[in-house]
């Protein structure tokens, strides 16, 4: 039984040898992913659902800080909501954790604006899961949560 298990592990590892890894040039890919995160922020600032449409697949899942879960269509519709007017969205302490054809991007965000004419200011953290397929990066899942003002940011 141990021999069969060891063989299966060896077979799996050897199957990965020929798989190209887009993160071989880690610095370039990390820079690209951070640029995509910044493009995402700009799309949100300008209610640009077309810009985000190419960054997220049809299977996209978003979990908002209040626990709301949205699919791609819901997320893009929410993005166009004219009652939400962000005046600033900034990421800080962004880190990219590369894996085979996948990268996890985490960081802090600070956003200001108005929602239904009431001012807001949020400090939070985000986790985005990106996959590399069809020669491009797409974010398949995103999660945000709020942190208290003054918490480690």
Show which residues each predicted segment covers:
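Residue-level marker of positions within ordered structural domains that often coincide
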Residues: 6-7, 135
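Hydrophobic h-region of N-terminal signal peptides that target proteins for export
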Residues: 10-18
